A protein has these predicted regions:
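N-terminal leader/targeting and accessory segments in enzymes
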Residues: 1-85, 89, 266, 335-340, ...
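Generic hydrophobic/aromatic pocket-lining and core-packing "Φ" positions
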Residues: 49, 163, 198, 202, ...
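Acidic, Mg2+-coordinating active-site environments of NTP-dependent enzymes
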Residues: 62-63, 67-70, 176-314, 339-340, ...
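Phosphate-binding loop of NTP-binding sites
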Residues: 82-212, 216, 220-228, 432
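ATP-dependent carboxylate/acyl-activation modules
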Residues: 101, 302-304, 423, 427-429
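Short amphipathic alpha-helix with an adjacent loop that forms part of the alpha/beta core around
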Residues: 168, 401-410
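Glycine-rich phosphate/pyrophosphate-binding beta-alpha loops
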Residues: 301-303, 319-329
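Peripheral docking tails and interdomain loops at the edges
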Residues: 395, 414-431
Length: 433
C-alpha cells in the first residue's frame, strides 16, 4: 500500500470530513459525497470526474493531471492506493473497537448476526452487503461516521496476502474467523494456502496486541490463533441446534443451560456463528435478553440460508455461493432433516483448480448416498455424472435445459435444497419450483 505525502493526506482527509461519504460509482447518488475515480478492466472513472461534480459530489480524486488546480479535485499518483491510504488515515482517528471478520464460509451472515447483536447496545457501523475486498473495505471505513461507536469489517480474499493488506488498512482491534475450509483453492494455492491466507487476520492481531475470538469447533482456526495473546473462546460444543421445518421459525437454538430461543435462520452449520455473535456481544456488554431478541428477529436475505415456501414446495435456498466445505455442510444438514421427498439441485463450484473434478464427484456421491434425489447443472458435475449412472441423478449441461426439465416435471410436495456458486445464479429457479 502506498504512502501519501502528509500534505496530500491532509487535503484528502479534509475533503472527506466535508462530505457525507465516499463513492466510486457515478451511477449512485453522489450528492454530498466524495468521488474516487478508480480504473478497472471495463471502466475508467477518470472519464467521469466532471459528471460526478455535476451530480453533486463535493470532491473528486483522480490521476488525470488536467484537473490540477481545481479546488474540488485532488490529483493523486495512484487512485486505488490513495483510497486505501485515506481509509487507514481516517480509521486511525477512531478510539472504538474494530472487529475484523473473515473465513471460508458464512462471513456475511455472521457479520449480520454480530452487527444486530451489538447494535442493541452500540452505535454500530458494518460492511454493507459483501463489500469485503481491497476496494470494499476502504469504502466501508470511509463511509463510517467520523466517531463511530463500533465498526465491524468483513474481509474476503481469494489469494494469500490479501487479508494481510485488508488488516493493514482496517487495523482491527479484534478478529473472528468463521472457519477455514476448502474455498478459492485455485487462488490460494491449495488447502494449506487457504489456511495461511485466513490466518493473516490473527497474525495481525498477534503483532498488534489484538484479541481473537476463537471458534473451538474448527481445529484450523484454533491452530491459527496460537500466537495471539488475548483469546476468547467460542464454545459451540455446548450449544444445540433443533430444526423445525414448516414452522415460522425454522430452528430453535438450545443454550448450555437448556433454555431455547427461536431463529428464522436455516442450517445447523450456522450454529457456530450464532454462538460467536452471542459470545462477542457478551464480551462487549450486550445483555443476554437483548442478544436473544436480536437473533430471533434476524431474517436471512440475498439467497443465504433462506427457507422459502413456494406454494408447491419447501425450498432451502442457499444459492449465494458454494465451495466444497459449504456444500458438504448444506447436504449433510439437509439429509439429516429426514424429509419425505428430498431433492438437491446443485450447481458447479468455481475456483477449485486441480481439485475441481474430485470435489464434484465427492459431493455428488455424498448427496446420492444420503438418499437425496440429485439434479445438477454445470460442466464439472457433468464430468462426474459420466462416471455414475444412478437413476436418482439427473444432470444438465446448461441452466436452460434444467429449467425445461423442471417445467416438464412440475415438482410438488417436495423439500428441495438449492445451492451453487454465484455464477450459477440458481436463485432464478424459484419460479419453477
Amino acid at each position: 500500500m502506498m504512502d501519501l505525502p502528509p500534505d496530500l493526506e491532509h487535503r484528502l482527509l479534509t475533503a472527506r470530513d466535508a462530505s457525507a461519504g465516499v463513492s466510486t460509482d457515478t451511477r449512485a447518488d453522489l450528492a454530498g459525497k466524495m468521488f474516487f475515480a478508480l480504473k478497472g478492466d471495463n471502466f475508467d472513472g477518470n472519464a467521469f470526474v466532471q459528471h460526478a461534480l455535476d451530480s453533486g459530489a463535493t470532491h473528486a480524486v483522480t490521476t488525470d493531471v488536467q484537473w490540477h488546480g481545481h479546488p474540488s479535485v485532488t490529483v493523486v499518483p495512484e487512485e486505488l492506493g490513495a483510497l486505501q491510504q485515506l481509509a487507514r488515515a481516517y480509521r486511525r482517528r477512531w478510539t472504538c473497537p474494530v472487529l475484523g471478520l473473515t473465513g471460508s464460509n458464512g462471513k456475511t451472515t455472521t457479520k449480520e448476526l454480530i452487527r444486530d447483536v451489538l447494535a442493541t447496545e452500540w452505535d454500530v457501523h458494518a460492511t454493507a452487503g459483501n463489500f469485503n475486498n481491497h476496494i470494499g473495505v476502504p469504502l466501508t471505513l470511509l463511509n463510517a461516521p467520523k466517531a463511530p461507536g463500533f465498526v465491524v469489517v468483513e474481509m474476503g480474499a481469494n489469494h494469500q496476502k490479501e487479508i494481510a493488506l485488508l488488516a493493514d488498512i482496517a487495523e482491527p482491534t479484534h478478529g473472528y474467523i468463521t472457519n477455514i475450509g476448502l474455498a478459492h483453492l485455485e487462488g490460494f494455492g491449495g488447502e494449506e494456502g487457504v489456511y495461511r491466507g485466513k490466518k493473516e487476520l490473527f497474525d495481525h492481531l498477534a503483532t498488534h496486541g489484538g484479541t481473537a475470538f476463537v471458534q473451538e469447533s474448527d481445529e484450523k482456526v484454533v491452530r491459527a490463533s496460537a500466537d495471539v495473546q488475548e483469546r476468547v473462546d467460542v464454545p459451540t460444543s455446548e450449544w444445540r441446534w433443533h430444526a423445525e421445518a414448516g414452522t415460522e421459525h425454522q430452528a430453535h437454538i438450545q443454550r448450555p443451560d437448556g433454555q431455547t430461543f427461536p431463529m428464522h435462520l436455516e442450517g445447523s452449520y450456522n450454529l457456530p456463528n450464532v454462538v460467536a455473535a452471542v459470545v462477542i456481544g457478551d464480551h462487549f456488554g450486550v445483555p443476554w435478553n437483548r442478544a436473544q431478541h436480536a437473533l430471533s428477529a434476524y431474517v436471512p436475505s440475498n439467497h443465504r440460508s433462506q427457507a422459502v415456501d413456494t406454494g408447491n414446495n419447501w425450498v432451502l435456498l442457499d444459492a449465494y455461493n458454494a465451495n466444497p466445505s459449504s456444500m458438504t455442510f448444506a447436504v449433510n444438514d439437509f439429509a439429516a432433516r429426514k424429509h419425505a421427498s428430498p431433492w438437491a439441485i446443485l450447481g458447479d463450484m468455481a475456483e477449485l483448480g486441480d481439485a475441481s473434478a474430485d470435489a464434484h464427484e465427492r459431493l455428488a456421491h455424498l448427496a446420492l448416498d444420503a438418499g437425496l434425489e440429485l439434479w445438477t447443472v454445470g460442466t464439472w458435475f457433468g464430468r462426474a455424472k459420466a462416471k455414475d449412472n444412478r437413476p436418482s441423478w439427473r444432470h444438465f449441461d446448461a441452466y436452460d435445459a434444467l429449467v425445461t426439465a423442471l417445467t416438464d416435471v412440475s415438482p410438488s410436495g417436495r423439500q428441495i435444497l438449492v445451492k451453487g456458486s454465484r455464477s450459477a445464479g440458481l436463485e432464478r429457479l424459484l419460479p419453477y419450483l
